[in-house]
Amino acid sequence: GWNDNSIHTALSHLIVRTVYSPSEWATHRIMKENSAACELYSGNPDWTPGINALYQMPDRLFELKEPLERHLCNTTDHLFNIDNRIALFDLTNFYFEGRKAGSHKARFGRSKEKRSDCKLLVLALCINREGFIRYSSILEGNASDPKSLPDMIDKLAEKSPATNEKTLVVIDAGISTEDNLQRIKEKGYNYLCVSRTRLK
């Protein structure tokens, strides 16, 4: 379960990872030597989470991904009075230097950092015009850009139903196939994209 200690661990972990972008091992060292993040949440200047708790935290947070994203979206919408009239879709990938033998999604694919020797995962994001992430998906490393969009559009339709003032979906040329553009229209949205073909 989530007791006070695990909540303090999660919040401290997120702050240090966001500020410094280190590994879990480096996060633990920074917490002990160069950060008051742990004291900020626990109220105890001598408290630091154990290294094993830090390694386990990403998996524990990922189990709550859907409700966490929904809560963060609702909170930012209310706080900043956001209407989410524009939805930007984008994909990127990241590589692993280890073998990732136990992963069912890590695959060899087209690395944006030219690391053809490493397995990849693809991160798909839907972002509003204010820059807040509406939702995210982790896809297989060899997922092609066009094939990733239908699932994202379905999620958008579920979480942000079309209204009289239609949401504008912004996508890049890598995703804008005729089938995908048709799917966007069928869901009741407008779209803006770079054409994959010359104007006729």
Model-identified regions with their sequence ranges:
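Dynamic "connector" segments at or just before major functional cores
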Residues: 1-107, 117, 124-144, 150, ...
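Extended aliphatic helical segments
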Residues: 16-19, 122, 169-170, 194
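Short, solvent-exposed loop/turn segments at the edges of secondary structure
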Residues: 118-120, 186
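Short beta-strand-initiation
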Residues: 120-122, 179
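An internal, acidic/charged active-site-proximal segment
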Residues: 144-200
